[in-house]
Amino acid sequence: MQYFEWHLPNDGKLWKQIKEDASHLRDIGVTAVWIPPAYKADEQQDEGYATYDLYDLGEFDQKGTIRTKYGTKDELKKMIDELHKYHIAVYLDVVLNHKAGGDFTEKFMVVEVDPKERTKALGEPFEIQGWTGYSFHGRKDKHSDFKWHWYHFSGTGFDDAQKRSGVFQIQGEGKAWSEGVDSENGNYDFLLCNDIDLD
């Protein structure tokens, strides 16, 4: 059962609500619950698809809040334990292909491409300033000390120096769009935030 929808309030109560509903879910025959992204997004009111920190489940003071839109890490763990008590599986929605809400800007070379034809460059390479630096200050290296930089991404959607949106393919050795996406309109997979380079 999907236990969320796009327009839930930003009140931090979803994990508590699901926990309180666990026995009822069992009684009506629910055997699995699909929950929204539990980690910190770029803003508290975000549904969780603008991924900021996969290691922050509502535990650290980052992006102006400790809890996520849905609650705290402790509430999440209690909710999962309660569902498991009633033999209900939990499926977590996770976004692994992009990051949002960088902590600092970096300068790097890009080529702007046609948003409707990603394989078509609109000019020569040039330098932009993008929000591609992730240091996760509030987490202080707990769970992971990995820091993200521009070279971990294949594209970005905003040049902070010019305050301009676009589809910017990051340049460098081995940098390219993913091959395995729909070829409609020339690699139609849309760019959201900072596209993680999975190659």
Q: Where do the language-model regions lie?
A:
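Substrate-binding/active-site clefts of carbohydrate-active enzymes
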Residues: 1-20, 27-31, 37-75, 79-199
